[in-house]
């Protein structure tokens, strides 16, 4: 069976086209949505990951992960067609990183 991105996976994906201050290019992203949603709909919710750490309040450090480094940009949620963008699994984050990302996203949404 073909790969379906799941919550907590880090995927390598092309974020172009982009506009303004959005992250762009071919880069890792943290999958937020579940495999059941992603497989059924063909889309996934994700946050880009960058190695350009700027200590912004919505950055979440990946920590000690041999496959990916940098920070998750929890305030830059994207809904992407993971099939059309050929998402490839790069690794998985810890539950602590996933929880912190979701908590920061909740702060963005709820204010």
Regions found by a protein language model. Give the residues of each.
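Conserved functional hotspots at enzyme active or ligand-binding sites that engage polyanionic ligands
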Residues: 1-111
